[in-house]
Curated annotation (Swiss-Prot):
Entry similarity comment: Belongs to the peroxiredoxin family. AhpC/Prx1 subfamily.
Gene: ahpC
Note: The active site is a conserved redox-active cysteine residue, the peroxidatic cysteine (C(P)), which makes the nucleophilic attack on the peroxide substrate. The peroxide oxidizes the C(P)-SH to cysteine sulfenic acid (C(P)-SOH), which then reacts with another cysteine residue, the resolving cysteine (C(R)), to form a disulfide bridge. The disulfide is subsequently reduced by an appropriate electron donor to complete the catalytic cycle. In this typical 2-Cys peroxiredoxin, C(R) is provided by the other dimeric subunit to form an intersubunit disulfide.
Protein's name in the database: Alkyl hydroperoxide reductase C
PROSITE patterns membership: THIOREDOXIN_2
Keyword Disulfide bond listed: yes
Domain Thioredoxin: start-end pairs: 2-161
Tree of life domain: Bacteria
Native source organism of the sequence: Helicobacter pylori (strain ATCC 700392 / 26695)
Catalytic activity: a hydroperoxide + NADH + H(+) = an alcohol + NAD(+) + H2O
A Gene Ontology cellular-component term: cytosol
Length: 198
């Protein structure tokens, strides 16, 4: 489990948003001001994967406005990533997504993030990494279960709230909601006002 630990850094080829290939793309050199969202999908040209990739891509600006870059990874080569980007959505492609697509052809990144499944493909892992390279949130889904990009945005908001105010974010917390002081009195006050909504 990587939560609370430093995210494994890596250097690998990546197809960038402008379709150029960076042969030495490094996670640590591509964080946003506040961190990054690193997410894995099993394989290009498959089924649930394009829905997740398009969903994250549609929210790239939302993540960037909060200071987080989105970075995607699969075990495919940069050539396969490029071909998938250049396949129209109506033909099962992903179109011109704007975030970097890392080529984990050695499977070492998937292995380091503990998402490598049967030494073949990555499970649907997503990691919220802060500006200090610390993993603050992780979710790993089985192959048939797609992830929710809006939930990752909610977790980004929660982390930013905690960093700014020092308050923890209770169950179901959304941006604009009250946080909670991490004390016995803080939880008692919060539950008195909010337990019915939980």
């Amino acid at each position: 489990m990587l939560v609370t630990k430093l995210a494994p850094d890596f250097k690998a080829p990546a197809v960038l948003g402008n379709n150029e290939v960076d042969e030495h793309f490094e996670l640590s050199k591509n964080l946003g001001k506040n961190g990054a969202i690193l997410f894995f999908w099993p394989k290009d040209f498959t089924f649930v994967c394009p829905t997740e990739i398009i969903a994250f891509d549609k929210r790239v600006k939302d993540f960037q406005e909060k200071g987080f870059n989105v970075i995607g990874v699969s075990i495919d080569s940069e050539q396969v990533h490029f071909a998938w980007k250049n396949t129209p959505v109506e033909k099962g492609g992903i179109g011109q997504v704007t975030f970097p697509m890392v080529a984990d052809i050695t499977k070492s990144i998937s292995r380091d993030y503990d998402v490598l499944f049967e030494e073949a493909i990555a499970l649907r892992g997503a990691f919220l990494i802060d500006k200090n390279m610390k993993v603050r949130h992780a979710v790993i889904n089985d192959l048939p279960l797609g992830r929710n990009a809006d939930e990752m945005l909610r977790m980004v908001d929660a982390l930013l709230h905690f960093e700014e105010h020092g308050e923890v974010c209770p169950a179901g917390w959304r941006k604009g909601d009250k946080g909670m002081k991490a004390t016995h009195q803080g939880v008692a006050e919060y539950l008195k006002e909010n337990s019915i909504k939980l």
